[in-house]
């Protein structure tokens, strides 16, 4: 199984790895698109980048860092991304076998494996990044069907934990998706928004550490339930699971 996580806007700075080498990234079919997007992102003057990326003057260093994407140091992607989901995942305590089951969606790289070395960058899935010819394509238009095709080619069950914006960049037919819901006092259900990432991080950790390999949505549910999580199947869509918290 391959567990695809969402990226995070917040990222760890620095790194001790050599500068980015596209040939050291997984999913080589995405290389050309990655190179084009990176070149366009790196070409943005800082003041223009603030507007394009929708960030404030306070985050000017983020835009400045984008100007040196090919020379900045790298670190494994799973440690580059930070925030609520990644805190709950606690990748530093995961064994190599567990890390091999993890991938991450990305506006810049499409999808990468957890251990792929990447630099710090700023680019979100909702950005309209100018091309050299002045066009303003969406990230969805830039990626086309390439992310979907790359994930289909892994020939494994894909558990897609990406947020909606990143799922739109490359949906995967028959991928298992997860809704997080809480039970209200009156027994009704409410979709969890604030702690959604935290619970998905815990869910991903359980799957990554499983001694069993999941090949179906039912397998995923069984693994999660065995770890003490409350997971339900959707009778109308077997690939959609609900994590009840």
From Swiss-Prot:
A Pfam cross-reference name: H2O2_YaaD
GO biological process terms held by the UniProt record: response to hydroperoxide
- Could you tell me which cysteines form disulfide bridges? none
Query: Which cellular components does GO assign to this protein?
Result: cytosol
Entries under InterPro entries matching the protein: YaaA (IPR005583)
Q: Which family does it belong to?
A: Belongs to the UPF0246 family.
- Official protein name in the record: UPF0246 protein cgR_1824
Per the UniProt record, the source organism is Corynebacterium glutamicum (strain R)
- Taxonomic path: Bacteria, Bacillati, Actinomycetota, Actinomycetes, Mycobacteriales
């Amino acid at each position: 199984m391959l567990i695809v996580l969402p990226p995070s806007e917040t990222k760890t700075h620095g790194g001790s790895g050599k500068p980015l080498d596209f040939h050291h990234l997984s999913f080589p079919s995405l290389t050309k698109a990655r190179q084009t997007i990176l070149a366009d992102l790196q070409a943005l003057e800082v003041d223009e980048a603030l507007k394009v990326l929708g960030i404030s003057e306070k985050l000017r260093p983020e835009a400045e860092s984008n100007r040196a994407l090919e020379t900045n140091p790298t670190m494994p992607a799973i440690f580059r991304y930070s925030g609520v989901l990644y805190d709950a995942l606690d990748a530093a305590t995961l064994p190599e076998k567990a890390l091999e089951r993890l991938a991450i969606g990305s506006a810049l790289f499409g999808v990468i494996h957890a251990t792929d070395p990447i630099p710090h960058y700023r680019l979100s899935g909702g950005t309209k990044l100018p091309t050299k010819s002045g066009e303003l394509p969406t990230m969805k238009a830039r990626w086309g069907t390439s992310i979907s095709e790359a994930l289909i080619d892994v020939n494994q069950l894909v558990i897609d934990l990406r947020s909606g914006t990143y799922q739109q960049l490359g949906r995967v037919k028959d991928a298992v998706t997860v809704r997080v819901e809480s039970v209200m006092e009156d027994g009704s259900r409410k979709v969890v928004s604030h702690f959604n990432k935290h619970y998905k991080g815990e869910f991903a950790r359980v799957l990554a550490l499983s001694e069993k390999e999941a090949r179906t949505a039912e397998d995923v549910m069984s693994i999660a339930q065995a770890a003490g999580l409350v997971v339900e199947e959707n009778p109308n869509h077997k690939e959609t699971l609900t994590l009840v918290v």
